[in-house]
Regions:
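Nucleotide-activated chemistry modules centered on ATP-dependent adenylation/adenylyltransferase
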Residues: 1-221
Length: 221
């Protein structure tokens, strides 16, 4: 057994810091390891705190369902840390694309289709997206739980200067009004058409005319 039951896990939490270089885990608590030794170290740390037991019902390749109980303390710590670092350094669209490709890649590996053009294409995507995934993530482990308590990267897209909603050189309050009107344009057009066809309540207001010039709602400030 790699993992203790939570009732036998320590009564005090432990913080572990995992370092990544271009998406690859390279260190634990500041000490560099090769891949095998790094996993073994995280298995020991995570297993000690009851982390990483996965109990699930899954679909086999042949179609039958089976129940599996897996121990992966080191893998669970890596997944939590790596996902958090990606959230810090990758933009929203890239993260969304990764969420689409990740399960496809997992299915490919599970089904033994490693030597395929599909896998090579996915690898090209991974290589590009992971190039900036460099930094450290701090995890607090306690009786089976894994909580992210810190993350740091020189490639972070988060910057306090740009999230204060105050005036700065990147973001101006006045920019928001035009963006909101443009972003909501499809919904406004649909509402106008529904009113014209009698498919939506008019709230006691007359239905707008069909031309853009006569529709204040369609005019972009």
């Amino acid at each position: 057994m790699l993992t203790r039951t939570v009732t036998k896990a320590p009564d005090l939490p432990e913080t572990v810091v995992i370092g990544f270089d271009a998406g690859t885990p390279v260190s634990v608590n500041g000490e560099r390891f090769g891949g095998v030794d790094l996993i073994a170290t995280l298995n020991e740390i995570g297993g000690r705190h009851g982390c990483g037991v996965v109990d699930l019902v899954e679909d086999r390749l042949v179609g039958m369902k089976s129940r599996g109980v897996y121990e992966t303390p080191g893998g669970s710590l890596l997944y939590a840390a790596h996902s958090e670092l990606e959230q810090l350094v990758l933009d929203r669209r890239t993260l969304a694309a990764k969420d689409l490709i990740a399960p496809r890649y997992a299915d490919l590996v599970y089904e033994g289709r490693w030597w395929t053009t599909e896998r090579e294409a996915y690898d090209a995507f991974v290589n590009v997206t992971q190039d900036r995934v460099t930094g450290t993530v701090s995890l607090r482990l306690y009786k089976g739980s894994i909580a992210v308590v810190g993350r740091e990267s020189s490639n972070a897209l988060y910057d306090e200067r740009f999230v204060t909603f105050g005036e700065d050189d990147v973001y101006e309050q006045s920019d928001a009004a035009g963006f909101i009107r443009l972003f909501a344009l499809p919904a406004r057009v649909r509402a106008i058409k529904d009113q014209e066809l009698g498919l939506a309540p008019t709230l006691d207001a007359p239905a707008p005319e069909a031309t853009t010039a006569e529709h204040p709602a369609l005019q972009i400030a």
